[in-house]
């Protein structure tokens, strides 16, 4: 209350009213004071006054509800496009044994290091690589395997079927592979183990217009487990003592490989490709889930490919034309993360005549500005979580 009788007060709803002397109070029947609401002031929690007649109001900022993102993680969706995984997924139940879902029991300390989901996947992986019987050493691989959407590179390993892969995943996950596939490096080699990774010039095998990447000096199953890590951030620990004996026998009989050899080869490959988190997880005899890194790598790749120099390394094949800028992306990631984009890019008739001479498809989204679309694309292409919204209002 001021010296002249003026009063300031706030309501429970956060509005402020000021009681002032009515200049018409001299007229009969007119009240001496009147209340008026202070405009454009909301969410007030307290009001103050001093002996000079000045008033103040303390306003609380609106606490918005936290934004929660639901759905698959980036690593989940990338696992779904793992080139050899469609066939393995079809066999997932076929190769599951009754005891596979309860392997660990009370011995398992951490759920993330459980083999409950891994053993059926290891069975499917062995079924993909190794023939069903010793009398069928040259079993044919289904032609459906070679129709992997978006595959633009093929990995060749001695005595194994060619496996298509996505260049954007390999380049984002390993700077060594990025250097190889962009032509900056011709070959990488580990001299003690004689493991060699190189890009083969020309076309070999049944793939046309697909870049061949050769890996020699290691078993095919080691390369496929490495691919599984690059796509999923997970690891299939075939050397874990908890893996059923029949799987180990299958690898030794048909693949001519001991599970502990695979672990050693993976260490060499991880060091060669500079994957320190994978190297750290391979120090244990039992499964140790690697620290997640897919989001970090894809965030860096998404930012880098927006620069002119990034196009040479990452080779984006989609340009989203927004109202105020153009954004470079990869169709393989967009189709894996969004049914909207999958409906376009999975249709060969839609894409056939839309490729530009630069090898890109331009998608016109001129009705959308970059500011709101930035968060959508950071979620789709980089897998970022709700923390990216912390910058709102800054």
Question: Which residues make up each language-model segment?
Answer:
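Eukaryotic tandem repeat interaction scaffolds
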Residues: 1, 360, 365-366, 392
């Amino acid at each position: 209350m001021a010296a002249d009788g003026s009063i300031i007060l706030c309501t429970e709803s956060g509005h402020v009213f000021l009681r002032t002397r009515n200049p018409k109070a001299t007229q009969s029947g007119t009240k001496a004071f009147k209340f008026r609401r202070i405009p454009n002031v909301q969410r007030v929690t307290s009001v103050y006054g001093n002996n000079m007649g000045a008033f103040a109001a303390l306003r609380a900022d609106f606490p918005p509800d936290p934004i929660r993102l639901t759905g698959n993680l980036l690593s989940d969706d990338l696992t779904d496009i793992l080139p050899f995984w469609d066939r393995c997924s079809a066999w997932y139940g076929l190769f599951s044994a009754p005891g596979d879902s309860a392997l660990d029991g009370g011995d398992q300390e951490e759920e993330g290091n459980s083999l409950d989901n891994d053993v059926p996947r290891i069975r499917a992986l062995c079924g993909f690589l190794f023939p069903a019987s010793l009398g069928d050493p040259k079993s044919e691989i289904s032609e459906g395997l070679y129709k992997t959407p978006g595959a633009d590179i093929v990995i060749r390993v001695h005595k194994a079927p060619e496996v298509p892969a996505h260049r954007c995943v390999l380049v984002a996950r390993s700077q060594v592979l990025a250097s190889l596939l962009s032509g900056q490096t011709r070959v990488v080699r580990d001299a003690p183990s004689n493991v060699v990774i190189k890009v083969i010039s020309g076309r070999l095998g049944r793939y046309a217009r697909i870049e061949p990447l050769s890996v020699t000096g290691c078993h095919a199953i080691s390369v496929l487990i490495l691919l599984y890590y690059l796509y999923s951030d997970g690891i299939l620990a075939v050397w874990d003592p908890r893996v059923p004996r029949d799987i180990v026998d299958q690898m030794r009989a048909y693949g001519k490989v001991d599970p502990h050899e695979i672990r050693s080869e993976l260490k060499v490959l991880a060091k060669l490709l500079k994957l320190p988190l994978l190297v750290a997880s391979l120090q244990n005899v039992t499964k140790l889930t690697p620290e997640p890194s897919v989001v970090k790598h894809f965030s860096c790749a998404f930012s880098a490919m927006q620069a002119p120099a990034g196009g040479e390394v990452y080779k984006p094949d989609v340009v989203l034309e927004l109202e105020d800028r153009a954004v470079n992306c990869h169709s393989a990631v967009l189709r894996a993360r969004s049914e909207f984009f999958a409906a376009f890019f999975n249709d060969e008739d839609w894409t056939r005549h839309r490729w530009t001479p630069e090898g890109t498809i331009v998608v016109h989204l001129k009705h959308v500005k970059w500011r709101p679309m930035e968060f959508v694309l950071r979620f789709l292409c980089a897998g970022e979580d709700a923390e990216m919204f912390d910058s709102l209002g800054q």
